[in-house]
Amino acid sequence: MKKSILFIFLSVLSFSPFAQDAKPVESSKEKITLESKKCNIAKKSNKSGPESMNSSNYCCELCCNPACTGCY
């Protein structure tokens, strides 16, 4: 019985503000900047197969992922 009460007490205590780090969010050292890019979607080529699947335009047409080359 004592062990269960202690377990419940520690569980509740872990969610209290005393158990959590109280640093403000602005104090983080990492700064993230977002860049918006336009997708130049080229006309679909008549190619089919792995050659067209690996092209940068295919990646751009799917999701405009900024990590893809040719997706600007």
Curated annotation (Swiss-Prot):
Propeptide boundaries: 20-53
Pfam families from the UniProt entry: Enterotoxin_ST
Keywords: Disulfide bond, Enterotoxin, Pharmaceutical, Secreted, Signal, Toxin, Virulence
Signal peptide interval: 1-19
Cystines in this chain: C59-C64, C60-C68, C63-C71
GO CC annotation terms, alphabetical: extracellular space
UniProt-recorded Gene Ontology molecular function terms: toxin activity
Keyword DNA-binding: no
Subcellular location field: Secreted
Function description: Toxin which activates the particulate form of guanylate cyclase and increases cyclic GMP levels within the host intestinal epithelial cells.
Family: Belongs to the heat-stable enterotoxin family.
Protein name (Swiss-Prot/TrEMBL): Heat-stable enterotoxin A3/A4
